[in-house]
């Protein structure tokens, strides 16, 4: 009897084996945002570079420390390498505009300006790591607010899925990252996340890329009141892989519910 109980508990807590679905990613996780159950896991605990998906954490720390309407003065030192929202030294922009530039354009200049405004970069990065610990992201370390490659900057697909679940529950963050296009302060910004236009129920999240990290993608989708989050790291086929994971994952939930109902109906 106890063996049967143990096996039943193991089945409930273990990741669902992804028969019929696969990805091109070096690491991938699909997680149920409502229950925390891992539905699919491929190298989910492997520490890897995460590129600009870092900016999910950056945005969350900003939302802790500043209000969207506050104004930030851009400085020369905020001009950094990589993707940009094309800020100019001396201009004044709101925190909300910078958050759009961070999440839609993946602006490293926006990340630098926000971190500097919210207590300075060193303090800001400490809070990024502090929040990571609070969320149980034990295999994660942040070294900067933008996601540029650094030996001390890494995470795992599982940890990023935990972060995505937390982020999806923040209404302001969810509104910002699911915006397809916006014009604020004379700038028109278009979301890099193609899934918003191609995957039913997608509520966005964050793309990323560096030569060393490859393509990284964190996303969330909601269908029929259920919400899933997907993470792929080092995946050249990430758009298609996320679409396939969601189609499989939402169908998997339906199959499990149907099986449960069938068991209840069995005399």
PLM region spans:
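Intrinsically disordered regions, especially transient/low-confidence alpha-helical propensity segments
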Residues: 7-8, 16, 139, 236
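Short, positively charged
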Residues: 10-11, 33, 183, 197
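Domain-terminus/edge residues, biased toward the C-terminal soluble/receptor-binding domains
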Residues: 137-138, 149-267
